[in-house]
């Protein structure tokens, strides 16, 4: 048995991935934003992500919004994928099959799902009141109304399969796809209700809907690119109630469709709630019915979603890796949107690499082996780890920043990168103190 996690993956949105610094139009959050940077910055950003992955044992980069007219469309993606392939890194698209713009996220292409819905409004799902199913995203989480398709509509399903065949034929360099059925709610039309048999009628996301399309979608991908990664997003932890049917002794027709998929299929799970609540232990194992597949556990550590962008999450990532390994998964994923110039992001990324290689290592091992050489020694690395908690304790920040100022004098100007990391941390902490003090004064 492998004593490490084989697959290490970055998850990202195109519009909030910022590895090229000081760019106009930079965004730090969102799920449905326009792309506001210069078109050429898209490839420049992701080349730097690829370089990091190549240098630090990361296998792949997933991108939401990969195909978009605003940053070069197919030509830009082919250039990026070619660069990544030369570096031994896989670029894969993250795409909603029934939502999120489909395969071509934004543009005039016929393979942009939004364009298809304009011409085929009968393919949009229905809510409980029989009205079209839309989610109206509000800033900072997006800007546009987003429709959710009807998974029971044959015309829509054929369009989805055709779009997958098209993209993997058009971009042979593409490394795979993370498929999502869409998490904008579930269609409540009579056909969908009958097909689901009420199993997950109250779930915001339907596992039955996933089973209805994932096997056919995977076959469409592999018909054009047999070595492509196909990652089936579940939106759940495998322990969640919505996934209880994976333990059924007598699989439903929906479940059997998933179980019959090839062994090379990936299933992807998320762990944030269970990490933070402690509702995932080393004794918990993947459902036996899924043992033949490959599995990735993703978290939102240090992001716009959980804990805040650029926050230090070393122990959280350690637990993600340890529990994933103990549960029988083979891979882990975190967001890779922030540049490694941001010292906390750098240490989070290094933590994923370190604990994927050594799932039973401790935080103290990481401090000794990884942080200490980059911060001036173990004593200082332990200080950094402690100061990393201060965004949640702003009253301590002035003392911490004073300590950073004093210890910087010990390094002189000989090791630029050590100084850069400490100065970045001081500036990051000061921003939280400034806001805390300003709110308190007002």
Spans of features found by a protein language model:
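Active-site-adjacent "subsite" loops/lids of carbohydrate-active enzymes
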Residues: 93, 97-166, 292-299, 303, ...
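Active-site groove signature of glycoside hydrolases
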Residues: 145-146, 160-199
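Substrate-binding groove of N-acetylhexosamine-processing glycoside hydrolases
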Residues: 1-5, 15, 19, 32, ...
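Mature N-terminal, pre-catalytic/accessory segment of carbohydrate-active enzymes
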Residues: 1-95, 115-117, 122-129, 158-169, ...
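Short acidic/polar active-site loop segments enriched in Thr and Asp
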Residues: 59-60, 175, 330
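Aromatic- and acidic-residue-enriched segments that line the glycan-binding/catalytic groove
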Residues: 25-27, 73-85, 99-143, 188-198, ...
């Amino acid at each position: 048995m492998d004593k490490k996690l084989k697959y290490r993956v970055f998850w990202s949105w195109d519009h909030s991935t910022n590895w090229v610094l000081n760019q106009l139009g930079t965004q730090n959050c969102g799920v449905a934003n326009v792309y506001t940077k210069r078109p050429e910055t898209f490839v420049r950003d992701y080349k730097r992500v690829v370089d990091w992955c190549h240098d630090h044992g990361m296998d792949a980069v997933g991108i939401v919004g990969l195909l978009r007219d605003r940053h070069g469309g197919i030509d830009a993606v082919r250039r990026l994928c070619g660069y990544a392939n030369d570096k031994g890194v896989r670029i894969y698209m993250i795409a909603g099959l029934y939502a999120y713009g489909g395969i071509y996220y934004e543009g005039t292409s016929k393979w942009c799902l939004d364009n298809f819905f304009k011409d085929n409004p009968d393919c949009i799902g229905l809510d409980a009141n029989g009205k079209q199913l839309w989610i109206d995203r509000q800033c900072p989480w997006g800007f546009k109304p987003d429709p959710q398709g009807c998974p029971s509509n044959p015309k829509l399903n054929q369009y989805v399969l055709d779009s997958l065949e098209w993209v993997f034929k058009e971009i042979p360099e593409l490394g795979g796809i993370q498929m999502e059925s869409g998490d904008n709610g579930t269609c409540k039309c009579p056909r969908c209700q009958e097909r689901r048999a009420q199993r997950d009628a109250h779930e915001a996301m339907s596992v039955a809907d996933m089973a209805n399309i994932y096997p056919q979608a995977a076959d469409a991908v592999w018909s054009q690119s047999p070595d492509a990664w196909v990652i089936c997003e579940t939106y759940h932890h495998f322990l969640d109630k919505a996934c209880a049917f994976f333990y059924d002794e007598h699989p439903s027709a929906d479940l059997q469709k998933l179980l019959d998929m090839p062994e090379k299929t990936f299933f992807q799970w998320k762990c944030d709630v269970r990490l933070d609540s402690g509702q995932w232990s080393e004794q918990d194992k993947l459902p036996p019915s899924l043992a033949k597949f490959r599995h990735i556990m993703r978290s939102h550590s240090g992001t716009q979603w959980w804990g805040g962008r650029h926050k230090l999450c070393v122990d959280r990532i350690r637990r993600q890796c340890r529990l994933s390994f103990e549960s029988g998964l083979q891979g882990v994923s975190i967001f890779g949107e922030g540049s490694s110039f941001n010292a906390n992001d750098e240490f989070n990324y290094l933590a994923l690499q370190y604990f994927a290689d050594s799932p039973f290592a401790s935080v103290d091992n990481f401090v000794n082996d990884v942080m200490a050489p980059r911060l001036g020694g173990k004593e200082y690395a332990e200080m950094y780890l402690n100061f990393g908690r201060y965004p949640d304790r702003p009253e301590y920040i002035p003392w911490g920043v004073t300590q950073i100022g004093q210890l910087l004098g010990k390094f002189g100007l000989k090791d630029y990168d050590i100084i850069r990391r400490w100065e970045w941390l001081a500036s990051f902490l000061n921003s939280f103190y400034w806001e805390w003090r300003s709110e308190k004064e007002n």
